[in-house]
Amino acid sequence: VAFLYPKSPDTSDWIYAHDLGRNYLEETFPDQMKTICVNDVTEERTEQVLNDVIRQGADIIFEVAPQMMKDSLKVAVDHPDVKILNCSLNTSHKYIRTYYARMYEAKFLSGMIAGALAENDRIAYIADYPIYGMIANINAFALGASFTNPRARIYLAWSTSENYDRERFLKDNNIQVVSDQDMITPRDPGRQFGLYECSKDGRKLNLVMPLWNWGVFYEKMIQSILAGSYQSEENSEGRALNYWWGMSAGVIDLICSKNVPTGVKRLVDHLKSDIKKGDIVPFYGEIRAQDGTLKNKKDKAMKPEAIMEMDWLTDNVIGEIPTMGELRAEAVSYTHLRAHETL
């Protein structure tokens, strides 16, 4: 099983999470498979690297970035016996399956905690790439915050924008409660991850960490392949497949620290259980965009396609989706493949 990474696990929390999943896979199937990983795979090198790992014997390949999709299609057609899966949302192709996780479920719960703890009703959300899935995360967080605090306002910043300065952004907007990158990286094991609170003396008080359990997803995929059900899915459907799993499948979770008040944690645990059972969905009821447009009707659950393809922000978000020209050069190629039409 080969894993293709656009960066290295040391420098990216996204890649680090996937690499933890790869290690979990090796521990789960020690006698049935082995894994290899290739770091720093650029869009231009994708086809070459794919052919290299196939020559090394890889018959299952996980690509963890959407920009690899385009140059993978030729390889997938040339090697129909090799299973190639790309980690992206809404980019399915009949020759390549895609997979992603419903992180917005955890963000909704994280937003609830943020709303309950933001004394001045101001909360920061620091996003990275404006791709499919990210906008749903932001909006779910904003809806969660309004669930516990109707006055809450979400101040949005993009860490990949040219003029990004976290500390200045927080100071200028008088913000203490912050939703930042999802987890630490080995090279930068700081406290600025997940949901945290900035104290007046400058300390960071960690509250919540959303968790991508990629190991669980990869385990389920390998089990499906070993059992023969992966191929039967393909034969019976005859169309592109996009795996989009969440808390109910164990692929997404939320870890609360002891710094979260007991009453708030009890509420979050209860709602997390309801989300797992399907009794509660974050995108339900009347939802309006920043311009007042009605995006979801009362007593209705939003359709999955509408969640995947969001290119708008809820009416309690202050900020906007950046244009390509506002992103740093290294972020443009990552964003380009599945950028929103507003970019």
Question: Where in this protein do the model-derived segments appear?
Answer:
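Periplasmic-binding protein-like
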Residues: 58-66, 85-87, 175-184, 208-212, ...
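An alpha-beta-alpha
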Residues: 22, 109-152, 156, 237-259
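Extracytoplasmic "Venus flytrap"
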Residues: 1-21, 25-29, 36-43, 66, ...
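Conserved small/polar residues in nucleotide/adenosyl-binding loops
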Residues: 335-342
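Flexible loop/hinge segments that line or gate small-molecule binding clefts
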Residues: 77-100
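Structural motif
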Residues: 34-53, 159-171
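Hydrophobic alpha-helical segments within soluble ligand-binding/sensing domains
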Residues: 99-121, 211-231
